[in-house]
Amino acid sequence: MAIKGPRKHLKRLAAPANWQLPRKVKAFTVRPSPGPHSMDKSLPLLLVVRDILKYADNAREAKKIIQTGKILIDGLKRKEYKHPAGLMDVLSIPEMDENYLVLFDESGRISLKKTDKTDAKLCKIVNKTVIKGGHIQLNLHDGRNQIVKVSDATKAEEDVYKTGDSVLVSIPEQSIVGHVAFGEGKLAYITGGKHVGEFAKIVEVENRALYSDIVTLENKDGEKFKTVKPYVFIVGQDEPVISM
């Protein structure tokens, strides 16, 4: 039998392994709504409020809290309990003066890191294209697109943003206010593989034509390791450009 329409339910046993979620308490959990992040790199807001922050004992209480509009993601009110909070999103509760950054812990599980109040977030450029009018469109990891107006997209001095770079996006205005290029010597945050959740400096980049580039990194203990470029998220030069 064919599947007709979008799936609306999710069994706990089928939920992504990196969700911090008891598997055998109940049969079903919340399926995040389609949007800025893939399901394995985000958590629905209800689970954030109930299971991670522990601000509610059950789904009903969590929904009431979310529907008040007191929880912000990237500076915007989110009242939909299925809305996904994903990697590098800034979650704020102004009434309680609490701010969190969505990251992965060293086991690869989605977690919240308490941070200082911030007016910007980091986004990774996953693709880019030249659009009508000759301007450049940057496609970022959290689903947003940013238009960079240029007079000539073929000129290197104007086309400064490359795939794999990171940009600093102001919140809630959602405009680019900073740029950190991908390259040797840059500080990276690892988002997948054996070293997920670690910070390390890029030592070498091996370019490959048909496969993902291989990046050699060195962590704070002096240990060198290799991973693929899609797992490398640039966060700064010597220190992260935001509180992490």
UniProtKB/Swiss-Prot annotation:
Entry similarity comment: Belongs to the eukaryotic ribosomal protein eS4 family.
For this UniProt record, give its keywords in alphabetical order, as a comma-separated list.
Ribonucleoprotein, Ribosomal protein, RNA-binding, rRNA-binding
Q: Does Ribosomal protein count among this protein's keywords?
A: yes
The GO biological-process annotations, alphabetized, read as: translation
Q: Domain named S4 RNA-binding: which ranges?
A: 43-106
Gene coding for it: rps4e
Q: Which GO terms describe its cellular component?
A: cytosolic small ribosomal subunit
One GO MF term attached to the UniProt entry: structural constituent of ribosome
Q: Which HAMAP family match?
A: Ribosomal_eS4
Q: Which PROSITE patterns does the annotation name?
A: RIBOSOMAL_S4E (PS00528), S4 (PS50889)
UniProt-recorded name of the protein: Small ribosomal subunit protein eS4
Quote the Pfam families the UniProt record gives.
Answer: Ribosomal_S4e (PF00900), RS4NT (PF08071)
